């Protein structure tokens, strides 16, 4: 009897957490706009982020964090994000149209 109540409570809470995650993802992704353009649509020499596969972006950000991928700025920026934040950022940009 207890398990169904826990499942029901979790089902009710799920919709409440999605908007908060969307807001957090959008806020984190906004920090990328200075170099990579609004919503990741770069107009200059920077790589566009909009539409990039989530797994690819997670991999690249982790490579910046570890120093496996050379960079001038990104290695420092990537170190400031948690795994959860990287996942949110990657999901946000993957959902954007190119």
Regions found by a protein language model. Name each.
Residues 2-9:
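Sec-dependent signal peptide recognition
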Residues 13-17:
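N-terminal signal peptide c-region/cleavage motif recognized by signal peptidases
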Residues 25, 39-69, 75-81:
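Gly/Gly-Pro-rich "capping" loops immediately C-terminal to redox-active cysteine motifs
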Residues 30-38, 89:
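The canonical Cys-X-X-Cys-His
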Residues 66-69, 79-98:
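C-terminal capping alpha-helices of c-type cytochrome domains
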């Amino acid at each position: 009897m207890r398990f169904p109540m826990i499942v029901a409570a979790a089902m009710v809470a799920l919709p409440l957490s999605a908007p908060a995650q969307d807001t957090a993802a959008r806020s984190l992704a906004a920090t990328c706009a200075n170099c990579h353009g609004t919503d990741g649509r770069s107009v200059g020499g920077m790589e566009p982020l909009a539409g990039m596969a989530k797994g690819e972006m997670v991999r690249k950000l982790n490579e910046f964090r570890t120093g496996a991928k050379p960079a001038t700025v990104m290695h420092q920026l990537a170190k400031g994000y948690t795994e959860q934040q990287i996942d949110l950022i990657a999901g946000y940009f993957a959902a954007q149209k190119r």
